[in-house]
Structure formats: structure tokens, C-alpha cells
């Protein structure tokens, strides 16, 4: 058997090959392969990357063949920083980098290390998310940003680097669903609107939380009219239950909204 390789058997009796290496008294699994030669190649690459401290991460990622992308990042970080992390993380001073690809590297505060060392980031349709207990959560939710938040509309990257997710670089513009911040005559105002079959404007408000309450009320009316759609709910943390109820009761939605809802019942 070639160095770093041992055999294993699947439930159906198929033989496959596992590669592993020991470094700094830690036994590291390198993956499973259909061919012994590939498993040995993974071992050879891992040995080279771990032994030669002058091999930079970018070079290792560009020249690996059998070793997986994630495992390469893990090994180089272990070599340089002495910490074994299963996800593709490389530690820097006071922050860390999460490698999605060789060209897409995200920066996070060190406070998030524990979370992302046990949660893999995935990208789909331009959105970054993690899976937790069978559910998918946008990484933006950790900043209090609503799902599918849009850069420039709902939040800003302060240094204009869209890969820098350190807390100091995230500025929330619009924390509420159904609310858009606008500037009219040099003054900041907030438009509430609901999406059912296209957008319907619910009015302009001087405070974002009032627009958020208007949106909540519009959602409640829509559901009360039998419109079967899941609407996100806004929570205004600084209002007591009675304060929220008073504002909710006093807030009047546009008269046309009731007619708009009725139009869906006659289709």
C-alpha cells in the first residue's frame, strides 16, 4: 500500500481508499478516493504543504490536484497558526478569512470564529447562507439585516469592500421588511410598501418604525382577507406591547388598499 493510504469497504462491498497524515501529533483525514494513486497524491500534496512553510496559501490552492480546496486551506492554516479548523478558514491578526473560492475570500471578526468553524458558508443566486438544523439562514441575519437585504439599499459596506463582513464595516440603513429609506427635499423619510402581486405603496412616514408598523398592519389585513402568503414580520424592540398596540390602532392605511385586497378575492 502506498504511503498515507489505507483501504476501506462500502456497504455494497466496494473497496475505496482513504488518505490521512499525522502532523504535530494530530491525525488528519484527507478524504476518500476511488483510486489508490489519487489517495497517495493527496497525501503527497499534504505532506509538501505542511512541511514547507514557505509555500503560501495562494500557491497551494493553485497547484493542488487530489487534495480538496477546503482541506488545503485547513492544512495551511494549521501549519501557520497551529489551530485545526474543519471549515476553510485562515486566521489573521484580529480577524479571519473564509475561503469560498480562490478569488472569493470573506473577512470576519474573530468573535465569529466559533460560529463559522462549525457552519459552512454556501453561495446560491448571489446570496450567502449557512445551514443550521435543516434550515438555511442568510449570513446577513447575524447583523440584524433582513433576508435578501440589498447592499446600498438595506445596508452599506463602509469601506466599499463587499467581502468585508467585519462588524465595523457593516452599516445598516434599513432594518425593517417592507420599508425603504428615501430622501425628499433633503429630508430622510420612509416608504412602506407590500408585495402581493407587485408592490403596493402604503404611504410615506417620518420614522422607519412607523413605516414598519404600517407594513405589519397591511400584512395582517392581507392574511385576514384570505391571501395565503408568508409575510416577514417586523419587531420593534424598543416599543412596549401597549405602545406598539396604540400606534398600530391609530395608524390608518390608504383607502385604496382595501380595494386592492378585494381585487384578489374575485380572481
Where are these regions (language model features)?
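Boundary-flanking segments of nucleic-acid-binding domains in nuclear regulatory proteins
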Residues: 1-267
Amino acid at each position: 500500500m502506498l504511503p498515507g493510504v489505507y483501504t476501506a469497504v462500502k456497504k455494497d462491498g466496494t473497496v475505496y481508499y482513504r488518505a490521512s497524515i499525522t502532523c504535530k501529533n494530530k491525525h488528519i483525514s484527507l478524504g476518500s478516493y476511488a483510486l489508490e494513486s489519487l489517495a497517495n497524491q493527496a497525501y503527497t500534496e499534504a505532506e509538501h504543504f505542511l512541511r514547507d512553510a514557505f509555500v503560501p496559501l495562494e500557491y497551494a490552492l493553485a497547484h493542488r490536484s487530489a487534495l480538496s480546496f477546503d482541506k488545503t486551506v485547513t492544512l495551511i492554516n494549521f501549519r501557520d497558526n497551529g489551530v485545526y479548523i474543519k471549515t476553510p478558514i485562515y486566521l489573521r491578526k484580529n480577524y479571519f478569512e473564509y475561503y469560498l473560492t480562490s478569488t472569493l475570500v470573506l473577512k470576519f471578526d474573530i468573535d465569529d470564529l466559533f460560529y463559522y468553524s462549525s457552519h459552512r458558508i454556501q453561495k446560491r443566486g448571489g446570496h450567502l447562507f449557512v445551514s443550521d438544523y435543516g434550515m438555511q439562514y442568510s449570513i446577513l441575519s447575524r447583523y440584524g439585516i433582513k433576508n435578501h437585504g440589498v447592499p446600498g439599499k438595506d445596508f452599506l459596506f463602509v469601506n466599499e469592500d463587499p467581502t468585508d463582513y467585519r462588524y465595523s464595516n457593516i452599516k445598516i440603513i434599513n432594518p425593517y421588511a417592507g420599508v425603504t429609506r428615501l430622501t425628499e427635499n433633503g429630508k430622510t423619510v420612509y416608504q412602506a410598501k407590500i408585495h402581493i402581486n407587485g408592490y403596493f405603496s402604503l404611504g410615506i412616514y417620518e420614522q422607519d418604525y412607523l413605516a414598519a408598523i404600517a407594513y405589519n398592519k397591511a400584512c395582517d389585513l392581507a392574511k385576514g382577507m384570505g391571501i395565503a402568503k408568508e409575510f416577514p414580520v417586523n419587531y420593534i424592540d424598543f416599543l412596549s406591547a401597549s405602545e406598539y398596540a396604540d400606534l398600530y390602532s391609530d395608524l390608518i392605511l390608504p383607502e385604496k388598499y382595501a380595494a386592492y385586497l378585494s381585487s384578489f378575492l374575485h380572481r
